[in-house]
Regions:
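Extracellular/periplasmic carbohydrate-active domains that bind, remodel
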Residues: 1-178
């Protein structure tokens, strides 16, 4: 019979697997928590596509409320988002709600036809938060009414971000850098 330490040794010597060529298509979701898509920092997800997705964020019914952002995507190379809409419950908003979309450590990405705002109407968080991203395009997207900042970026110098044909007339600020 093998000991637990035998399994742990095998795991530590194993190579990381690769996950690539993923498609999420035509989804309507009613969420009560943050949705997370996360690759490994040493082996990011590759070639990830999200098409025609509507997310409706609702108040959590548990006592231990953890939802912050609607969708967090982390450690991805080659991300394409086409037609993503995020709506927040305005009747019973959660105090911890922040951004509609968060990208962390994402390279070679394209966001086309995004529509949304931050979680709390007239709150201080951005609709789209970008942290350690590179070679990206955000185009033909729209800030919804009550949007504070449409896009917030960290690491301005390294990003290679292109913005094109976005409708930010309903946002107080189109982009900010922190």
């Amino acid at each position: 019979m093998k000991k637990r330490s035998d399994f742990e040794e095998n795991v530590s010597n194993s190579k990381l697997g690769q996950i690539k060529d993923i498609v999420i298509d035509t989804i309507i979701s009613h969420n009560r928590g943050t949705s997370v898509i996360k690759g490994h920092k040493d082996q990011p997800l590759e070639n990830f596509r999200i098409n025609n997705v509507q997310m409706f964020m609702h108040t959590e019914d548990s006592k231990d409320k953890r939802a912050t952002d609607a969708l967090v995507i982390e450690n991805v190379n080659g991300l394409k988002i086409n037609d993503l809409t995020v709506k927040w419950d305005e009747k019973e908003p959660e105090a911890k709600w922040k951004s509609a979309l968060v990208l962390k450590n994402v390279s070679d990405f394209e966001i086309r036809s995004f529509s949304g705002r931050q979680g709390l109407k007239n709150g201080n968080h951005p609709a789209i938060s970008l942290d350690t991203v590179s070679e990206g395009l955000i185009c033909e997207s729209r800030a919804e009414a009550g949007c504070s900042t449409f896009i917030q970026m960290k690491e301005k110098e390294k990003s290679g971000l292109t913005l094109r044909n976005n409708n930010v007339t309903k946002a107080k600020n189109d982009i900010s850098y922190v």
